[in-house]
Amino acid sequence: MLYLRKYAPELWDEKCELDAVSISDLKTNDNDISVWQVANDESNIGDIALAIALTRDRIQDFYAVVLKDEDIFTKELQMNPLPGETKYENLRNEHNNIKVPTFWEIGYLAEYMHKQMSNDDNVKYFTERFLKEQLYQAVKNNKISQEDIRDKK
């Protein structure tokens, strides 16, 4: 299993060392950090990207980093599965959380993400155009209704 985590490149990229600014991008909710499940072959990555985009008021391009479950578990980080808050209802259960109860876990996760970002294969950029095409296809294929996304343009 792979996970996708949205991130702000201006806080991470071009840095040789991890710093507090990068870690500030790892906002928590009840000591959890949000991630989305992606198939190992990344066959559902477009739908997952759309689910992430539909957590916001409008569709915007974004960067995400691919995380591997075996690496997460090697760091002894625990998962806390909770439905995602997205208008893409069919994918709400593809959401998960990484538990980070202390600064140690946040630090481990930040180091791992930073390492993953150093390999371009692990960094994904989803353009607004791509996301809108994904949305069009999802509506066309009855994966999501127009009523569910009426506020999303």
Label for each model-derived stretch:
Residues 25-31, 39-153:
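Conserved NAD+-utilizing ADP-ribose enzyme module
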